[in-house]
Amino acid sequence: METVITATIIGASILLAFAALGTAIGFAILGGKFLESSARQPELASSLQTKMFIVAGLLDAIAMIAVGISLLFIFANPFIGLLN
């Protein structure tokens, strides 16, 4: 039973690490492309900024979903029920 709990915690940690890494890379690419496109066409900057904030919210949602799944695995572990 301790092996299942340990493996679940390690899996949840890896899930959170990759979600944070993916979100950070996504924000970096998003910010870079926004600055590049705003410098290329300054008249579209306000329109692009609105779209950038929408995509930034979706990027944050990916990390929050990963946190929710990790909390589910840690506190309401469905794999422990399979042992009994």
Swiss-Prot record:
**Which InterPro entries does the UniProt record give?**
ATP_synth_csu_bac/chlpt, ATP_synth_F0_csu, ATP_synth_F0_csu_DDCD_BS, ATP_synth_F0_csu_sf, ATPase_proteolipid_c-like_dom, F/V-ATP_Csub_sf
GO MF terms here are: lipid binding; proton-transporting ATP synthase activity, rotational mechanism
Mainly localized where? membrane
Asked if the Swiss-Prot or TrEMBL record annotates the protein with the keyword Ion transport, the reply is: yes
Q: Which UniProt keywords apply?
A: ATP synthesis, Cell inner membrane, Cell membrane, CF(0), Hydrogen ion transport, Ion transport, Lipid-binding, Membrane, Transmembrane, Transmembrane helix, Transport
Residues the record annotates as the site (Reversibly protonated during proton transport) are 60
Enumerate the subcellular locations listed in this protein's record, separating them with semicolons: Cell inner membrane
Q: Name one GO biological process term.
A: proton motive force-driven ATP synthesis
Membrane-spanning residues: 9-29, 54-74
Question: Which residue stretches, if any, does this entry annotate as coiled coil?
Answer: none
Question: Cellular component per GO?
Answer: plasma membrane; proton-transporting ATP synthase complex; proton-transporting two-sector ATPase complex, proton-transporting domain
Similarity section: Belongs to the ATPase C chain family.
HAMAP family linked: ATP_synth_c_bact (MF_01396)
Q: What does this protein do?
A: F(1)F(0) ATP synthase produces ATP from ADP in the presence of a proton or sodium gradient. F-type ATPases consist of two structural domains, F(1) containing the extramembraneous catalytic core and F(0) containing the membrane proton channel, linked together by a central stalk and a peripheral stalk. During catalysis, ATP synthesis in the catalytic domain of F(1) is coupled via a rotary mechanism of the central stalk subunits to proton translocation. Key component of the F(0) channel; it plays a direct role in translocation across the membrane. A homomeric c-ring of between 10-14 subunits forms the central stalk rotor element with the F(1) delta and epsilon subunits.
Tell me how this protein assembles.
F-type ATPases have 2 components, F(1) - the catalytic core - and F(0) - the membrane proton channel. F(1) has five subunits: alpha(3), beta(3), gamma(1), delta(1), epsilon(1). F(0) has three main subunits: a(1), b(2) and c(10-14). The alpha and beta chains form an alternating ring which encloses part of the gamma chain. F(1) is attached to F(0) by a central stalk formed by the gamma and epsilon chains, while a peripheral stalk is formed by the delta and b chains.
Q: What more is known? A: Dicyclohexylcarbodiimide (DCDD) binding to the active aspartate residue inhibits ATPase in vitro.
Write the protein's name: ATP synthase subunit c
Q: Which organism is it from?
A: Haemophilus influenzae (strain ATCC 51907 / DSM 11121 / KW20 / Rd)
The upper taxonomy is: Bacteria, Pseudomonadati, Pseudomonadota, Gammaproteobacteria, Pasteurellales
